[in-house]
């Protein structure tokens, strides 16, 4: 048994040495910006359209071996929901602004000039601001003419956010083009699925679920330090 352990250690060491001879790690920093399209998955459901908001952040990437690396980001992202009143002349949306911190596995393929990549991993977010936008009084709408309150949940209009820390998982695909050895630009589309509810979800609460989902489209720039 001892011989097998020693042999395994020697084999791993030799493979690592070979890999290091053929590939040197690369560390890059960058920035990105784009748009976030989001909804909140309510149960019972709330009629919605996509809520659009800005997103921007900084990126850190370490390529540790050929075709694989790690990405960490610190992003500002505005999510929320926008209610659908169909033909009624009313509007309501809630802006929820977060600092999002994803840690992603980075898998890429291609040449030195152009690469395609896939990113996936966990993400945590901290709500830093919220804002309600409406063209009616959210505390006194029952007397409004033609307001579609029948068969519609309205408690969320003025309900305070209970959970201001979100966590979930995200995955995205994109492409990167090298300008030269140290500079590159990229585009990415990413999907986020939140696992925490913004409102209470106990039996006594109105909503059994109120988690975020979002689609982010961004363009970014990387500068290679190493």
Predicted regions and their residues:
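Residues that define the transmembrane beta-barrel architecture of outer-membrane proteins
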Residues: 25-27, 48-54, 95-101, 114, ...
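Predominantly the C-terminal beta-signal and adjacent terminal strand-loop region
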Residues: 146-148, 166, 171, 177-226
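Short glycine/proline- and aromatic-enriched beta-strand/turn motifs that initiate or cap beta-hairpins
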Residues: 19-59, 162, 224-226
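C-terminal segment of classical bacterial N-terminal signal peptides
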Residues: 13-19
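Flexible, solvent-exposed coil segments and beta strand-coil junctions
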Residues: 34-41, 80-87, 146-155, 195-201
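Gram-negative (and chloroplast) outer-membrane scaffold detector with strong preference
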Residues: 23, 27, 61-142, 179-181, ...
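Sec-dependent N-terminal signal peptides
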Residues: 4-13
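Extracellular loop and loop/strand-boundary signature of outer-membrane beta-barrel proteins
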Residues: 41-47, 86-92, 156-161, 202-207
